[in-house]
From Swiss-Prot:
It comes from the Eukaryota. This is Defective in cullin neddylation protein 1. GO terms for cellular component: ubiquitin ligase complex. Residues 94-297 form the DCUN1 domain. GO terms for molecular function: cullin family protein binding; ubiquitin conjugating enzyme binding; ubiquitin-like protein binding. Pfam families: Cullin_binding, UBA_4. PROSITE patterns: DCUN1. The gene is dcn1. May contribute to neddylation of cullin components of SCF-type E3 ubiquitin ligase complexes. Neddylation of cullins play an essential role in the regulation of SCF-type complexes activity. Keywords: Ubl conjugation pathway. InterPro entries: DCN-prot (IPR014764), DCN1-like_PONY (IPR042460), PONY_dom (IPR005176), UBA-like_sf (IPR009060). It comes from Emericella nidulans (strain FGSC A4 / ATCC 38163 / CBS 112.46 / NRRL 194 / M139) (Aspergillus nidulans). GO terms for biological process: protein neddylation.
Length: 308
């Protein structure tokens, strides 16, 4: 194998610094990702989580840090990516140790569901990090922690989510939540990611479409400003009010995933041009939005609307 270049050596150093893995593991993941450091680190995190979290957490939950290090060191040769050396391993264990006790504090049923924070625990936890249940930031936290359903957090999602943003205490988590609250209305990519994650989060178990009432509740959250969203209504057109009125006239039908996602795109297009200069009959919009455009034009008395 040819020697590493100066740039590759620097990447190995960066990988080791971020993950606390050894040089051999760093080089392996970097080669597999064609020396893309970010992809290599993501691959490392995704691989180590399912393979080793159980082995790491069990001793952390029942023993002190020193004893946990001794127990986990047995698995160092068996688990790819575990930090080498007792000092690095101790740092790793301390990090997970803190999360273990944080999770234990908020679990609803430690015996029945030891790896899950349920609704009651989630409410207490969100209160501690100063997040209200009826604000967009609450949904952003759910997206960050990959919550499987509303008001539920898993151990793996909790750990991986907060570790990805380097938050390991209630104070840091509260600060990150406050930062999200500021960024969501002004960062379209972040807003869209949270908005889209809300669809599966709010689905009733066993259903593929969102109940109309739930969809309207979430639109009122995302498309108004009081709880951290973006105002869709303007001084000239009450877009959100008309959208809900239009759907009510059509029978309050359930909302599918495509329509849910495209409504947010449509909202931003109406901000660019309320006169629909961007709209085309040949566009790839859902039929419901095509019909809404015609409905709005007729309601506003736009020229030519009656002939469409």
């Amino acid at each position: 194998m040819p020697p590493y270049t100066a740039a590759q050596k620097q990447q190995i150093t960066q990988f080791v610094s971020f993950t606390q893995a050894n040089n051999t593991t760093a080089a392996k993941f970097l080669r597999q990702s064609r020396w893309n450091t970010e992809e290599a680190i993501d691959a490392f995190k995704n691989r180590i989580a399912p393979a080793s979290m159980g082995l790491i957490f069990r001793p952390c939950a029942t023993a002190g840090v020193r004893e946990a290090v001794l127990r986990i060191s047995i698995f160092q040769k068996l688990i790819p990516g575990l930090p080498a050396g007792n000092d690095a391993l101790a740092d790793w264990v301390l990090y997970l140790y803190g999360f273990t006790f944080l999770l234990k504090e908020f679990r609803d049923s430690p015996e029945e569901n030891p790896d899950t924070i349920g609704i009651e625990g989630a409410m207490r936890y969100l209160g501690d990090i100063e997040v209200e249940l009826d604000e967009v930031t609450c949904l952003a936290i759910a997206e960050l922690l990959q919550s499987p359903s509303m008001g539920e957090f898993t151990r793996e999602g909790f750990l991986n989510g907060w570790r990805s943003v380097q938050c390991d205490s209630i104070a840091k988590m509260a600060a990150h939540a406050a930062n999200l609250r500021t960024r969501i209305p002004s960062e379209p990519d972040l807003f869209r990611r949270v908005y889209r994650y809300t669809f599966p989060l709010c689905l009733v178990q066993g259903q593929r479409n969102l109940q109309f009432e739930i969809a309207v509740e979430q639109w009122n959250l995302f498309f108004t400003t009081p709880k951290g969203g973006i105002a869709w209504n303007t001084t000239t057109t009450p877009w959100l009010d008309w959208w809900v009125e239009f759907l009510e006239e059509r029978g309050k039908k359930p909302v599918n995933k495509d329509l849910w996602q495209q409504v947010e795109v449509f909202m931003r297009k109406t901000h660019e041009d309320e006169a629909f200069g961007w709209w085309s009959e040949d566009g790839a919009w859902p039929g419901t939005l095509d019909d809404f455009v015609a409905w709005v034009r007729k309601k506003r008395g736009d020229e030519g609307a009656m002939e469409e």
